[in-house]
Every structure is written in C-alpha cells, then in structure tokens.
C-alpha cells in the first residue's frame, strides 16, 4: 500500500439513522423536540432543587448533578445530529470527531458513576437512617462526585489517544449518528488489537465497577426492606427506589447490549439501541424522578408558580410603561 493512501483523513461522514432523504426532516423534528424537552426538563429539575431548601440534601444534590450531566451528554451528540439531518454532506472533521468521542465518554461515565453514588446514598438512607446525616456529609458527597469526574476525564483521554494513533485509509463513512468508539474502530486499516484489549479490560471495568456498587447497594436495601414489619413501610421504601432502578435498567441494559460484544458484530441494531442511553434516558430522567416523588413534585410546582409570578409582574410593569 502506497504512502499516499496512509495519510490521515481530514473528515468523516456520519451516515446517521437513515440514508433516505424523505426521513431526514421527520427525524430532525423528532429529535429537536426530544432535545428541547431534555433541556427544559433537566433544567427545571436543577432550578427546583436549588431554589427549594427542603430539597437541599445528598439525594437531590446528586440528582441535580445527574440532570446537568444529562444536558451535557445530549448536547455533545444531538446538535450535530440535527445539523446533519438537514445537510447533504453530513461531514464531521477529524478533530471534531475525536472531541465528540471524548466528551461522549466523559459524560457517559459520569452518568454511570452518579447512578452508583445515588444507589449508595439510598442504601445508607434505608439501611442506616439514624447515621445518614453523619455518613452522607458534605465531604463524602464531594468525594463521590470528584472521583467519577476525575476518573472519567482520564478514562476518556486514554481511549481517544488510542484512537488517534490509528490509521484510516479506506472508507471514511461512519455507520452511526455520532463518533462512537466502535464504529470508528471499524474504519481503521491498522491494527485495533490494543484498542479492543483496553476496551474489554479497562473499559469493561469502568462500566462494571459502578454497576457492581449498584447491585450490592440494592441487595442490602432488599435485605433491610424485608425486615420492615409493616407493609406500608415496605411499600414506601420500594417506591423510593423504583425511579432510580428504572433509570439504571434503561441505562445499563442498552449499554450492555451495545458494548458487551465483539467489534465485528456491531450492526444497525446497535445504532438504534444507542439512542436509549444517549438520548432517551436523558429525556426520561426528569419525568421518572419527579412523577413518583412528592417532594420533587412540590419543588417543581413551587418553581413554576414562582416563574408565573415573575412573568406576571414583568407583564404588569411593561403595561404600565407602555401605557394604554
């Protein structure tokens, strides 16, 4: 193979969810709505938590950070996706592709570890309620937040640097709607052995570590709940955990389906499954966490009433200034 064929590609083409031109505008409308709902829903969760003193505790602290991470997570992927729906070329530069891959891995891992931190918090609240305030103090919360952020930055940097060392000399068409690791690796004409080994060892460990924490936490919760004598007490404990468990199943179920398989078997079905943990979980989180949570509902209602009041005052002042 000549040296001219080994030059680094300057851009990739993102094939997207569909190559049919008639699908592009409906998909654009659908994902624009999903993106706007994601931004609005998660932003309302953050504002409700920070404006209500009754929601100033570790559980809602982690939920507000998760909502912020979800906003960032979808923003890394969806805006470029929307542009490509209306574009004929559907290109992404090499540097932009690596940047998208990096931040996708960063916020994906932060989401994963935050779900583990929330499970630990629930475990302490249910299994050790009398020492909850002592155990889940400010220092503990900061550590549970600092570790996933620090780890996610270095974990993502490792994988992106390993991709950057590869040579792409055949096709530049990525069969995906964003620069995910596996579809990009499939384009490489140099050996991806090191990348695959790291993905199946360090990458797998980074996914399994928080998942194991969640499993252990919920096993302890289950044992503690079964010891509660009253049916009402058991129901209250289970309902407290149900929203978090729903998100965990959605997130880890789709991740396991996509990534716990050989690189060669990556197909269109994986592209669809990826939507679950990149887009759907982020848009569903505000609804899942608020629908069955009375405190969260109260906080959101209080925030909405406050916004309405401010808008009413602004409208009244505007009318006075403008006159009849």
From Swiss-Prot:
PROSITE patterns hit by this protein: G_PROTEIN_RECEP_F1_1, G_PROTEIN_RECEP_F1_2
Extracellular side: 1-25, 80-100, 159-196, 260-271
Residue pairs linked by disulfide bridges in the UniProt entry: 97-189
CDD domains for the chain: 7tmA_OR1A-like
Cross-referenced Pfam families: 7tm_4 (PF13853)
GO terms under cellular component: plasma membrane
Localization terms from the record: Cell membrane
Main subcellular location of this protein, as a coarse class: membrane
Segments on the Cytoplasmic side according to the record's topology features: 50-57, 121-139, 220-236, 292-324
Membrane-spanning segments: 26-49, 58-79, 101-120, 140-158, 197-219, 237-259, 272-291
GO molecular function, one term: olfactory receptor activity
UniProtKB keywords: Cell membrane, Disulfide bond, G-protein coupled receptor, Glycoprotein, Membrane, Olfaction, Receptor, Sensory transduction, Transducer, Transmembrane, Transmembrane helix
Membrane topology: Multi-pass membrane protein
A biological-process GO annotation: signal transduction
SUPFAM superfamilies: Family A G protein-coupled receptor-like (SSF81321)
InterPro entries for the chain: GPCR_Rhodpsn, GPCR_Rhodpsn_7TM, Olfact_rcpt
Glycosylated residues (UniProt): 5
Family: Belongs to the G-protein coupled receptor 1 family.
Role description: Odorant receptor.
Protein name in the entry: Olfactory receptor 1L3
Organism: Homo sapiens (Human)
């Amino acid at each position: 193979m000549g040296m001219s064929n080994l030059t680094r590609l300057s851009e990739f083409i993102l094939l997207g969810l569909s190559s049919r031109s008639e699908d592009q505008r409906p998909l654009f409308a659908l994902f624009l709505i999903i993106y706007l709902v994601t931004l609005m829903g998660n932003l309302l969760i953050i504002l409700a938590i920070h404006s209500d003193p009754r929601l100033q505790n570790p559980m809602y602290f982690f939920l507000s950070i998760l909502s912020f991470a979800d906003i960032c997570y979808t923003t890394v992927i969806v805006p470029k996706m929307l542009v490509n729906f209306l574009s004929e070329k559907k290109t992404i530069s090499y540097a932009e592709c690596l940047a998208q891959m990096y931040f996708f891995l960063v916020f994906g891992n932060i989401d994963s570890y935050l779900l583990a931190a929330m499970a630990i918090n629930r475990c302490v609240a249910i299994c050790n309620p009398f020492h909850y305030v002592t155990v889940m103090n400010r220092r503990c919360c900061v550590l549970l937040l600092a570790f996933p952020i620090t780890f996610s930055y270095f974990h993502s940097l490792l994988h992106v640097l390993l991709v950057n060392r590869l040579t792409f000399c055949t096709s530049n068409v990525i069969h995906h709607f964003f620069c995910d690791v596996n579809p990009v690796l499939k384009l490489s004409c140099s050996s991806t052995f090191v990348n695959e080994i790291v993905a199946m060892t360090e990458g797998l460990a980074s996914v399994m570590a928080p998942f194991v924490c969640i499993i252990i936490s919920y096993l302890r919760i289950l044992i503690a709940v079964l010891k509660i004598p009253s049916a009402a007490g058991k129901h209250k404990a289970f309902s407290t955990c149900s929203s978090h468990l729903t998100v965990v199943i959605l997130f880890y179920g789709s991740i396991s389906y996509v990534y716990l398989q050989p690189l060669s078997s990556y197909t269109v079905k994986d592209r669809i499954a990826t939507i679950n943990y990149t887009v759907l979980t982020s848009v569903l989180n505000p609804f899942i966490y608020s629908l069955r949570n009375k405190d969260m509902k109260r906080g959101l209602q209080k925030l909405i009433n406050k916004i309405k009041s401010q808008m009413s005052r602004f409208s009244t002042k505007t009318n006075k200034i403008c006159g009849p």
